[in-house]
């Protein structure tokens, strides 16, 4: 993964800069682009796949919460999703500055179009890019098809198997829920040589987590941006 920014953790706008005064919807193109003037080092966004197999930027399995539509993302073609305001990965890569660090969270295992979209944008070397996921199969597939890209295993709760999973997958690091920082469990993961990232910092008080030793990146939103 890219080095820390000037010796500090990278700050990644979680699902872009959404809500608040700007009113941008999470994971929308305006939200992703709004990360640039905030001074964030990069953006984090979620990826699923349309019915016609293209990577699209949305967190949930269905459109209900974000778009008021009960249909599943996988039931619609990418063009239909775009008309509803769901961008494709290609849309985002074309619009975002090359210098912006990208944390691409795969909600499901990737299809070939995912790798093609990134390679078309000359991101094959893996610079300024990390692939994160809670899904072991997704991380395993990326490791096989694009071993040059950094990978993080996302972790929500402590478990004795996480260290073994991470090492077996050969990931570069773990991205953990903020309340886990400072625990012996996290220290053990770092001692095993795994990079450490954290999610999601939302308040000014949460900014204290940025001083955690060895932290390389943090997903931020709201006051913590």
Predicted regions and their residues:
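Phosphate-group recognition and catalysis centered on beta-loop-alpha active-site segments
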Residues: 1-225
């Amino acid at each position: 993964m890219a080095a820390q920014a000037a010796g500090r953790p990278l700050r990644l706008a979680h699902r872009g800069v959404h809500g608040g005064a700007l009113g941008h919807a999470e994971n929308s193109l305006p939200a992703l682009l709004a990360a640039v003037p905030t001074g964030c080092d990069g953006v984090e966004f979620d990826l699923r796949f349309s019915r016609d197999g293209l990577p699209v930027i949305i967190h949930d399995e269905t459109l209900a919460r974000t778009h008021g539509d009960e249909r599943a993302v996988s039931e619609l073609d990418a063009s239909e999703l775009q008309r509803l305001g769901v961008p494709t990965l290609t849309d985002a890569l074309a619009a975002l500055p090359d210098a912006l660090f990208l944390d691409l969270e795969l909600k499901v295992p990737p299809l070939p179009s995912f790798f093609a979209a990134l390679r078309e944008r000359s991101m094959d070397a893996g610079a300024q890019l990390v692939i994160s996921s809670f899904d072991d199969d997704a991380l395993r597939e990326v490791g096989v098809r694009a071993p040059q890209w950094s990978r993080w295993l996302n972790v929500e709760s402590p478990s004795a198997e996480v260290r073994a999973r991470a090492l077996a997958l050969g990931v570069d690091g773990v991205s953990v829920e903020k309340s886990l920082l400072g625990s012996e469990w996290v220290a053990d993961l770092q001692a095993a040589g795994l990079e450490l990232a954290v999610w999601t910092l939302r308040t000014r008080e949460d900014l204290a987590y940025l001083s955690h030793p060895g932290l390389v990146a943090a997903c931020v939103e709201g006051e913590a941006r």
